[in-house]
Amino acid sequence: MAKVPPLIVICGTTASGKSQLALDLAQRLNAVILGADSRQIYKELDIGTAKPTLGDRQTVPHYLIDICEPTENFTLAEYQRQAQELIASLNQPILLVGGTGLYIQAIVKGLKIPAVPPQTNLREQLANLGQPFCYQLLSQVDPVAQSKIEPADVVRTLRALEVFYATGRPISSLQGENPPSYPIVQIGLGLEPEQLQPRIVHRTHAMVEAGLVKEVEGLINQYGEDLPLLHTLGYAEIKQYLQGQISLTQATESIIVHTRQFAKRQRTWFRKDSAIHWFDANQPNLLDSVTKLVQVDVNEGMF
C-alpha cells in the first residue's frame, strides 16, 4: 500500500520566520504550502499581513491565500472545508503554515464546526457596538470560546456571538473533534521575547517603508472606514494616522507594541499543544534539523 503523504504543520508567533522555513522546506521536500492565516486569505491585504510575495508563490505553490474579497464573510467552517478538500486532492507533501491557531486546530483536530449560516442583520448590530464591547459580551455568554479568540479578532468574535444568539447555545458547546487519519507532524518555531522584539521592530518599519500607509488608504477609499479588517493589527493604527489622530511615528510604535502583545498570546496558545515539536528559530542548521525530524516522524525515506 502506498504511503500517505504527511501534513506538516509549521506554526509559531508572528515574525518567527515561519514563511521562510516553509519555503525552504517545501523546496527540499517537493511540497506545497497551505496558508493558515485568517487575514492572508483576503485579497488586497498584502503588506500588513506579511503575505508571501508573488515570487515566493511562483517558487512554491501556495493555496488558501488571496481567496476572497475584503468585504466577504469567510467563516472557519469554509476555511476548513476548502483546506480539507485540498489535502484530499493534492498527492504530495503539504505544509500547513501560519499563526492562526484556530485554523490549524480546525484541520489537525478536525473540529466539528456548527452549521449556522451568517446572520447579516445581527452581525451588523453587533459590529456597531464595537469590538471591545462584543469581546466582553462573549466572555459572559461563552467564556470558553472567548478564551480561544484574540481580543482584536473581530470576525471570530462576531461569529461566536452570532452562533449563540441564533441557536441559544454557546459555539463551544456545539463543537467537537474528528481527527483526520493521515499522518501529521507539527513544527513550532520559538523565540524568547527579547529575541523576537528586534524582528518585530524591523518588520514593522519594513512594512511602513514598503507602502503600508498607501495600502490602508486604498482600502479606505475602496471599502470605507468601517471595513472590519481595518480594525485589525497594523491596519487600525495606520487608519488612526490617516484620520489625523496620531502621527506616523506613533502609529508605527503602536503596531510594534500591539504585535508584541499578539505574539505573547500566540505563544501561550501554541505552547498548550504537547504534540508540537519546538525549534529555536535562531538555531544553526534549522532547515536540516526540521527535515530530519519530519522524515523520522513519518518514517524515514518517505520523501
From Swiss-Prot:
The keyword Magnesium applies. It comes from the Bacteria. PANTHER family: TRNA DIMETHYLALLYLTRANSFERASE. Monomer. ATP binds at residues 12-19. Gene3D superfamilies: 1.10.20.140, P-loop containing nucleotide triphosphate hydrolases. It catalyses: adenosine(37) in tRNA + dimethylallyl diphosphate = N(6)-dimethylallyladenosine(37) in tRNA + diphosphate. Catalyzes the transfer of a dimethylallyl group onto the adenine at position 37 in tRNAs that read codons beginning with uridine, leading to the formation of N6-(dimethylallyl)adenosine (i(6)A). It comes from Synechocystis sp. (strain ATCC 27184 / PCC 6803 / Kazusa). Residues 37-40 are annotated as: Interaction with substrate tRNA. Its cofactor is Mg(2+). The record marks 100 as: Interaction with substrate tRNA. Its EC number is 2.5.1.75. Pfam families: IPPT (PF01715). Keywords: ATP-binding, Magnesium, Nucleotide-binding, Transferase, tRNA processing. Transmembrane segments: none annotated. This is tRNA dimethylallyltransferase. InterPro entries: Dimethylallyltransferase, IPT, P-loop_NTPase. The gene is miaA. The keyword Nucleus does not apply. One of its GO terms (biological process) is tRNA modification. Belongs to the IPP transferase family. Substrate binds at residues 14-19. One of its GO terms (molecular function) is ATP binding.
